[in-house]
Swiss-Prot record:
Factors inducing expression: Repressed by alanine.
Function of the protein: Inactive alanine aminotransferase. Forms a catalytically active Schiff base with PLP, but lacks alanine transaminase activity, probably due to an altered structural conformation of the dimeric enzyme. This suggests this protein may have a yet undiscovered physiological function.
Principal place of residence: cytoplasm
Protein's name according to its UniProt entry: Inactive alanine aminotransferase
CDD domains in UniProt: AAT_like
Length: 507
């Protein structure tokens, strides 16, 4: 504030006005306890330490035993030099600056800056959006884009119809999940059935909305499969304790496990939902990331099959399915786009959801546009098709190659057990740590897998997440890693670290 402005305020208060002791600042104890209790390990203590080391590398690179930080803690491909899809970025460039379209299509195409189909898609999207991505959209999302999503779901599910009225365009899948949970978590007796291990968004949301976590454990020995009998037992135990199992979270393909659910398993999950009136939230953001001869089955497709086969038995199942532009081949994490499809909900619940979504006006409009590009990429015969197809194939092959290489590396190491990758972007190997390492972690006051991950980071620059951040069976220890980082040197570095670690702490 300038001296003149200070003088202007000089006579505002009397001596009596200023005769008080200034109140203290708010402290942590004044905050929402749901926030203070919530944990999100993906950006927790180890990634925070990685950021500190990254700054140290800039200032004093010679003091650390590595040259770079490998962010294997989060599924963020473009941070790790994955090239964006050309068609996507061409359309986005035009949407951001539609004056480009004042130049004729032929002239623009001759400059090799934009393909004709990118120009046409951008024109269609601008027309659907209303002329500018800087304007708010409908709270449920741009109607034309919702129609494109509905068409995609219909194709994906073998002709089972989807309608734009059931689609909400969202700011990523995370915002869809938290919006749904804020609506469905009525009180402290609401139970959320959450797979363990799980993506920590869900346990964090349970804390935020004061709900009860009802964990159901995945079976590691059978490739992290889901056991419906285990889920039903958790439901029955909760009911005995006067807890209402209201929401069942399913992550398919799994995060952090990479497991892909079979059609039969999904059917059994739907049966539990039908019997107990439990709403299913099916997190399907990795549906394109499928490896090694397994097949993705959407929850909605299986539910529709059951409704046809057993009339009346599954008609009341309420399902919200989530998808995102952050994964698959788009990997546009920073654009913040996604969708949810809701089916089986009554009109009064739909009205409440619409009101909730309207409070935040609308999702990011550029993110909505990228959703359109995700569900309707260039098709055979389009000018961009071959380039787009080749770029997607390259991403897929590189990801699958690194996934299998990392898996094979883990298989040959002492004290590490790993299930074969089926999907998603992660491996979740089990650590069988020497007693000496367990004692050292206890001395330091941290979990054994956190001790391992911290040692890995400090020795190699590889940033991972301890399994304790995702939940795991008591007495077991894991680490979650992506396989997104380019090259293979970091995998060799990890192998050498692991061998040295076990040599140091072997009983």
């Amino acid at each position: 504030m300038t001296m003149t402005h200070q003088q202007d305020l000089k006579g505002v208060f009397t001596a009596k006005d200023l005769d008080f002791k200034p109140a203290g600042k708010i402290t942590k104890k004044d905050l929402n306890t749901g926030v203070t209790k919530a944990e999100y390990a993906v950006r927790g203590a180890i990634p925070t330490r990685a950021d500190e080391l990254k700054e140290e590398l800039k200032k004093n690179p010679e003091v650390l035993p590595f040259d770079d930080i490998i962010n294997a803690n989060i599924g963020n491909p473009q941070q790790l030099d994955q090239k964006p899809l050309t068609f996507t970025r061409q359309v986005l460039a035009i949407l951001e600056y539609p004056e480009i379209l004042r130049v004729g299509h032929n002239e623009l195409a001759s400059l090799n800056l934009f393909s004709r189909d990118a120009l046409e898609r951008a024109e269609r999207l601008l027309n659907d959006i209303g002329g500018s991505i800087g304007a708010y959209s409908h709270s449920q999302g741009v109607p034309g884009i919702r129609q494109t999503v509905a068409d995609f779901i219909t194709r994906r599910d073998g002709g089972e119809p989807a309608t734009p009225e059931d689609i909400y365009l969202t700011t990523g899948a995370s915002s869809a999940a938290t919006s749904l949970l804020s609506l469905l978590c009525k009180d402290s007796q609401t139970g959320l059935l959450i797979p363990i291990p799980q993506y920590p968004l869900y346990t964090a949301s349970a804390s935020l909305f004061n709900a009860q976590v009802l964990p159901y454990y995945l079976d590691e020995e059978s490739n992290w499969s889901t056991n419906s009998d285990e889920i039903e037992k958790v439901v029955q135990d909760a009911l005995k304790k006067q807890i209402r199992p209201s929401v069942l979270i399913v992550i398919n393909p799994g995060n952090p496990t990479g497991a892909v659910l079979s059609e039969e398993t999904i059917a059994r999950i739907c049966l539990i939902a039908a019997k107990y009136g439990i709403t299913i939230i099916s997190d399907e953001v990795y549906q394109e990331n499928i490896f090694n001869d397994v097949k993705f089955h959407s929850m909605k497709k299986v539910l529709r099959k059951l409704q046809h086969l057993y009339p009346g038995k599954f008609d009341n199942v309420q399902l919200a399915s989530l998808h995102s532009i952050s994964k698959g081949f788009m990997d546009e994490c920073g654009q913040r786009g996604g969708y949810m499809e809701i089916i089986g909900f009554s009109q009064e619940i739909r009205d409440a959801l619409f009101k909730l979504m309207s409070i935040s006006i609308c999702s990011v409009v550029t993110g909505q546009a990228v959703v359109d590009l995700m569900v309707k990429p260039p098709q055979p015969g389009d000018e961009s098709y071959e380039q787009d197809h080749d770029e997607r194939l390259k991403i897929f092959h590189e990801m699958r190659t690194r996934a299998n290489l990392l898996y094979e590396t883990f298989k040959e190491l002492e004290g590490i057990e790993c299930q074969k990758p089926q999907g998603a972007m992660y491996l979740f190997p089990r650590l069988v740590l020497p007693k000496k390492a367990l004692c050292e972690s206890e001395r330091l006051g941290i979990e054994p897998d956190e001790f391992y991950c911290t040692s890995l980071l400090e020795s190699t620059g590889i940033c991972t997440v301890p399994g304790s951040g995702f939940g795991q069976r008591p007495g077991t220890y894991h680490v979650r890693t992506t396989f997104l980082a380019p090259g293979t040197k970091w995998i060799q570095d990890w192998k050498e670290f692991h061998q040295d670690f076990f040599s140091k702490y072997r009983n």
